[in-house]
Swiss-Prot record:
<keyword id="KW-0658">Purine biosynthesis</keyword>
<feature type="binding site">
    <location>
        <position position="227"/>
    </location>
    <ligand>
        <name>NADP(+)</name>
    </ligand>
</feature>
<dbReference type="GO" id="GO:0006164">
    <property type="term" value="P:purine nucleotide biosynthetic process"/>
</dbReference>
<dbReference type="GO" id="GO:0004488">
    <property type="term" value="F:methylenetetrahydrofolate dehydrogenase (NADP+) activity"/>
</dbReference>
<dbReference type="Pfam" id="PF00763">
    <property type="entry name" value="THF_DHG_CYH"/>
</dbReference>
<keyword id="KW-0378">Hydrolase</keyword>
<protein>
    <recommendedName>
        <fullName>Bifunctional protein FolD 1</fullName>
        <ecNumber>1.5.1.5</ecNumber>
        <ecNumber>3.5.4.9</ecNumber>
    </recommendedName>
</protein>
<dbReference type="InterPro" id="IPR000672">
    <property type="entry name" value="THF_DH/CycHdrlase"/>
</dbReference>
<feature type="binding site">
    <location>
        <begin position="161"/>
        <end position="163"/>
    </location>
    <ligand>
        <name>NADP(+)</name>
    </ligand>
</feature>
<dbReference type="InterPro" id="IPR046346">
    <property type="entry name" value="Aminoacid_DH-like_N_sf"/>
</dbReference>
<keyword id="KW-0560">Oxidoreductase</keyword>
<comment type="similarity">
    <text>Belongs to the tetrahydrofolate dehydrogenase/cyclohydrolase family.</text>
</comment>
<keyword id="KW-0486">Methionine biosynthesis</keyword>
<dbReference type="GO" id="GO:0035999">
    <property type="term" value="P:tetrahydrofolate interconversion"/>
</dbReference>
<dbReference type="Pfam" id="PF02882">
    <property type="entry name" value="THF_DHG_CYH_C"/>
</dbReference>
<comment type="pathway">
    <text>One-carbon metabolism; tetrahydrofolate interconversion.</text>
</comment>
<keyword id="KW-0554">One-carbon metabolism</keyword>
């Protein structure tokens, strides 16, 4: 089984980001990503540190902003960043305050600065094939398949999960690559049978070990987007040991989709800065 190394792919994208950041800085522009933290969630703060560290290596300024005083303060913070000409990209970490939906928060992020595709308009533009930013995790799936030279045109793809961050947008991105996409979810009947017919499986449920050997046809590619923390550490949706003798390729967890997602956020920030 071939392991699709997200870290090496992220490094390749990073070289492009470095070059583009240098060009922007020579023109007097420092590409800047604002990360809004609505609470003290440890996972969100840990990921923000990863973004900061990665951004520092590729020439993008990453600015964390605390917005923990409640829903109104969060929206005020996003509005201020939206109006700030020095800020090129905005992301808001989750979980959000219970009183706010991702749609409500996303509507306050201008599409031009919506580098993680949180604004509903961004998803609409994606559905219509118009220019814009897709959610970075969904985009990372297609980026990995492209860089691994795994054909998508004509491929049968099973997407497990229909959420707005991965499932829905990745299905649209794969359709744009001429794949034949089936989206499965908690009410899907015969999930194992559907998955076993696929050339590519994309799983984004957060259920550890959901995808076992019975899901995977010989030679299929499996993209594991799920992540959960267990007593054994960080794990994905896929039982890697169970499918190792069957699958043709797999993204590991950690080290697969995650590093590419982070770098795509920074590449999107570069593109937003360049457009500005």
């Amino acid at each position: 089984m071939r392991l699709l190394d997200g870290r090496s792919m992220a490094a390749e994208i990073g070289r492009y980001v470095i070059d583009e950041a240098e060009r922007l800085m020579l023109a007097g522009k420092t590409p800047t990503l604002a990360v809004v933290l609505p609470n003290a969630d440890p996972a969100a703060r840990s990921y923000t540190h990863i973004i900061e560290r990665t951004a520092g290596k590729v020439g993008v300024r990453c600015e964390p902003h605390e917005a923990t005083a409640g829903p109104a303060a969060l929206l005020d913070m996003v509005d201020a960043l939206a109006a700030d000409p020095l800020v090129d990209g905005i992301i808001v970490q989750t979980p959000l305050p219970a009183q706010l939906s991702s749609r409500e928060v996303g509507e306050h992020i201008p599409v031009a600065k919506d580098v993680d595709g949180m604004n509903p308009e961004s998803l609409g533009r994606l559905a219509l094939g118009l220019p814009g930013f897709a959610p970075a995790t969904a985009a990372a799936v297609v980026e990995i398949l492209t860089r691994a030279r795994i054909p998508m045109a004509g491929a049968r793809v099973c997407v497990i999960g229909r959420g707005p961050v991965v499932g829905k947008p990745v299905s649209l991105l794969l359709l744009a690559e001429d794949a034949t996409v089936t989206v499965c979810h908690s009410h899907t009947k015969d999930l194992v049978t559907i998955a076993h017919e696929a050339d590519i499986i994309v799983s984004a449920t957060g259920v550890p070990g959901l995808v076992g050997a019975g899901f995977v046809r010989p030679g299929a590619t499996v993209i594991d987007v799920g992540t959960a923390v267990t007593a054994a550490g960080q794990v994905g949706d896929v039982d890697a040991a169970a499918i190792a003798s069957v699958a043709g390729a797999l993204t590991p967890v950690p080290g697969g989709v995650g590093p590419v997602t982070t770098m795509l956020l920074l590449r999107n920030t570069i593109r937003a800065a360049r457009a500005d």
